[in-house]
Amino acid sequence: MTSDQIKQLDANYIAQTYAKFDLALSHGQGCEVWDFDGNKYLDFTSGIGVNSLGWADPDWLEAVIAQLHKLSHTSNLFYTEPSARLAKHLVQVSGLKRVFFANSGAEANEGAIKVARKYSHDKYGDTRSTIISLVNSFHGRTISTLAATGQKLFHQHFFPFTAGFEHLIANDLNAFKTRIAQNDICAIILEVVQGEGGVCSLDQAYLQAVQGLCQVQDILLIIDEVQTGIGRTGTMFAYQQFELKPDIVTLAKGLAGGLPIGAFLLADKVAETLAKGDHGSTFGANPVSCAAANAVLTKLEPLFLTEVMRKGQKLRKALQSLPHVKSISGLGLMIGVEFDEHINVADVVTNCLKQGVLFLTAKTKLRMLPPLIINDEQLERGVTVLAQVLSEM
């Protein structure tokens, strides 16, 4: 089948909800992918931060194939080894107490919202149900996670949303202090680096002050690590770089290295909030996805994470010297590049694609989420192509 035939089938039969690259992918290996016409591309997207180990990692493939030969699905009515092992591993690396497995980041955030509401209801009754999130945040596309998302762009056409969500300006501590004085807040959900919002890191002083206020007023701190988690920023979780101790952490994207999975981790304080029957998922804790996630976590040893941090610093340094670059944001291998105002980021991405390198956007910024295994030569190649494209604009 040719690229044009695939695109036509897509146009005819798939709901047209995505602004796709003009590219039909056939296969991948490491940090490179090929289209159906035989063209090769260097990948700085990793499926929007999902393919942590790149494409077709041999150990990942071995784990997935072995599990497919045993159990592909069981439901959560039965115990399975992959989910039990994965839960233990996540608890050990996070310091939290329990894990619930879902299928996506939105599902993980929905679950975290339910935990926060139930914790508050059990302890305080019906008077503390409001959840604060931040302007410019992104937490998912379900009705409740859209309500939590602090971007009006995503709110069009879908009212009414789930009640009980309010958005505050990030890094404005006085606004947070003023709002929580009403004593009706059960939780705050935030990303320490706002990915879809433009790869914007929050201030450490703000985050630590918010955490302190939450502890005083028994407000749950939910950290959305859907995009930042599982080594993306150079530590297992981005919150670890800000010296935070969240009550709930949500995960997805890179956790299973390319298969659907979501999870929320619960600290001791809320570990027993959900009782049997309070929450569930038919496909959650899928044995194949959990086996894949175990393969990913096995690779993320301290030296591997140190290399992610080093490569991120190397990439940032190289980007600083490029023409039209105004600022660079992010942590580790989650990087945003802001250009001079006359540069159209969509044109940059399109022209880089024509030169064989795939990048993403985040609002007006170029976004880089390469596989964590990317090597120095590939980083340099990507920067060289970007420099060439920018020099011609």
From Swiss-Prot:
Pyridoxal 5'-phosphate binds at G105, A106, F138, D224, E225, V226, Q227, T282. GO terms for biological process: L-arginine biosynthetic process. Binds 1 pyridoxal phosphate per subunit. PROSITE patterns: AA_TRANSFER_CLASS_3 (PS00600). It is an enzyme of class 2 (transferase). CDD domains: OAT_like. Its main location: cytoplasm. Its cofactor is pyridoxal 5'-phosphate. One of its GO terms (cellular component) is cytoplasm. It catalyses: N(2)-acetyl-L-ornithine + 2-oxoglutarate = N-acetyl-L-glutamate 5-semialdehyde + L-glutamate. N(2)-acetyl-L-ornithine binds at R141, S281. The modification N6-(pyridoxal phosphate)lysine is found at K253. Pathway: Amino-acid biosynthesis; L-arginine biosynthesis; N(2)-acetyl-L-ornithine from L-glutamate: step 4/4. Keywords: Amino-acid biosynthesis, Aminotransferase, Arginine biosynthesis, Cytoplasm, Pyridoxal phosphate, Transferase. One of its GO terms (molecular function) is N2-acetyl-L-ornithine:2-oxoglutarate 5-aminotransferase activity. Its EC number is 2.6.1.11. It comes from the Bacteria. It is found in: Cytoplasm. May also have succinyldiaminopimelate aminotransferase activity, thus carrying out the corresponding step in lysine biosynthesis. Homodimer. Belongs to the class-III pyridoxal-phosphate-dependent aminotransferase family. ArgD subfamily. PANTHER family: ACETYLORNITHINE AMINOTRANSFERASE, MITOCHONDRIAL, AMINOTRANSFERASE CLASS III. This is Acetylornithine aminotransferase. It comes from Haemophilus ducreyi (strain 35000HP / ATCC 700724). The gene is argD.
